[in-house]
Amino acid sequence: MHGLLLAAGLLSLPLHVLAHPQPSTSTSLAGRAGAVDLNEFRVAHRSSYTSHDEMKKLPSIASFRQGTYLEVATELVKQTMPNMEFRLVDDHYVGDSGIGHVRFRQTMHGIDIDNSDFNVNVGKDGKILSHGNSFYTGPAPASNPMVKRDFIDPMQALNGVRKALNLPVKANGAHVENMSEHKVMFKGTSGALSDPTAKLCYMAKEDGSLALTWRVETDIGDNWLLSYMDAKESSKVHNVVDYVAHATFQVYKWGLADPTEGKRDILTNPWNLKTSPLTWLADGKTNFTATRGNNAIAQYNPDGGNDYENNYRPSPKNLKFEYPYSPDMNPPKTYIDASVTQLFYTSNVCHDLYYMLGFNEKAGNFQVNNRGQGGKGNDYVILNAQDGSGTNNANFATPPDGQPGRMRAYIWTRANPPRDASFEAGTIIHEYTHGLSNRLCGGPANSRCLNALESGGMGEGWGDFYATAVRLKPNDTRKTNYVKGGWVNNSPKGVRMYPYSTDMNVNPLVYTSNNKLNEVHAIGTVWCTMLYEVLWNLIDKHGKNDGPVPVFENGVPNDGKYLAMKLVMDGMAIQPCNPNFVQARDAILDADMNLTKGANKCEIWKGFAKRGLGVGAKFDPKNRTGSNQVPNECK
């Protein structure tokens, strides 16, 4: 679950329930008494990434036989990891940039190694563009654990997780139902929003060994956890992943970051029929008269509960979603219709824009009805306005494709009267982008690939980057600075360490700043700062389209702003599971190589190098090495 800040009690593992309060050094469970710090259970960085430039140095790749992108990808894994057992993950697709994305999961004795993945990117020419790899290469277990059933039963695992993490789940009288050979469901529990499950799997550990675990899944609202309990010791949790990282419409239209930037307008049929052909108010089976449709369902959620379908949502006559609102109105519930409408509008525009840039059905986007275009449906975004489960934050939960995303927008109490997160577009875009990055990085079927500290930080940085790119104004230049979350937080400094700026005197952050940072929002500020440099380099080269949608020429946005947004998005799908900054940088360069044949290589390199992520920069979680160097051809 990801939130805007670092709400007291959230962690930014793969879900996305983080928001944007001032950075905190603590990320614990839901802020409850006795809460456990989930940072202690983060997944370690294990991925390698072989970029396009590195691939060209491997002559053996050129001898690959021609075939489908699946066959080419499978052959690469077989040659790279001979004699290893793996399976094809059923979420492969060809993106709108022509790249075939194929992912494999390593297995041992027929059991998944849950954090051992191999992703292959096949270019439009049928050749390998790049690949990422986190396969386990240590000693294999001597015997198949399924033969002697040499592990604790799943109920012991659930109880062990409950105790170790102090979860509000009760299992007295609960029983186990088999779902498959390695997976069970717990029936009769209380305290979770859905029945917990457990799956037997291995986890590759930092010390190079392999642990047999029960992956216990518990959705408790503000945290949606995958807890890897040792299958032989019911008191030992190895890792934890959190999925939550916390008509006419009268709205602040797209591009206005908050109520200080303009007035509300009445917009007629604001949807884009190319990306939402069913409109925002239908799902192909039902035409709705409330804030519900194929992409999202928005409602008032004052008690913070999970029964969203029966909650109140505006349903006006003649589809006129026109309601009074002023930032001076109080209490917030007096303008709930306007709040739900604004949240519904902003999230749907996000859906439509991201669809145009490549986040479509095959890529794992959020829709009930995918209209036969690939991917898994039945997963609109659940949008809870004025959610009563918290304050001063917002969050987004991103389970795998086919399960609904969930956004919670809270009331912020740092102003008088309080301010509603639904009206700060930057907050909503940031949260929706958690859904984007979690579905693309690792593939639609795996929402566990932004769990390490640096990759989790990039998840926050991408949210800020897209929110900032969207709010750019016609007269902005590279000298324009922007803060994040200034309005909701009632602070001119916003909720980040520094404004986003290309001026080193205003924002001095560089790659090695991460050596002193241990919180995802702080690390995300470094990442977004780098992307802001790249953004302006591309705008200075290609100009800036100030319209609400990109204009494409041969599949490439013809301006720098949308080109940057496109390349960053393509990079998310190319990079390995749990990437670091260096790997994510290389993935963006490879995205440009695929899309434009590397026409923007130097603009990208110079943006990263200015902030210490140049040629020669190296990742070490405790001692990163910075570099301001660019390739010789860019000097």
UniProtKB/Swiss-Prot annotation:
Q: Which residues are glycosylated?
A: 287, 475, 594, 623
GO cellular component term of the entry, any? extracellular region
User: Where is this gene product found?
Assistant: Secreted
- Top-tier EC class: hydrolase
Propeptide span(s)? 20-246
**Details of cofactor binding:** Binds 1 zinc ion per subunit.
Q: Which UniProt keywords apply?
A: Glycoprotein, Hydrolase, Metal-binding, Metalloprotease, Protease, Secreted, Signal, Virulence, Zinc, Zymogen
Q: Which GO terms describe its biological process?
A: proteolysis
Classify the main location. secreted
| Cofactor(s) annotated in UniProt | Zn(2+)
**Which annotated residues bind Zn(2+)?**
430, 434
Catalytic-site annotation from UniProt = 431
UniProt-listed Enzyme Commission number(s) = 3.4.24.-
The UniProt GO MF terms for this protein read: metalloendopeptidase activity; zinc ion binding
Q: Which residues form the signal peptide?
A: 1-19
What is the documented function of this protein? Secreted metalloproteinase probably acting as a virulence factor.
| Family from the record | Belongs to the peptidase M36 family.
- Name-wise, this protein is Extracellular metalloproteinase 1
Q: Which organism is it from?
A: Trichophyton tonsurans (Scalp ringworm fungus)
Organism lineage: Eukaryota, Fungi, Dikarya, Ascomycota, Pezizomycotina
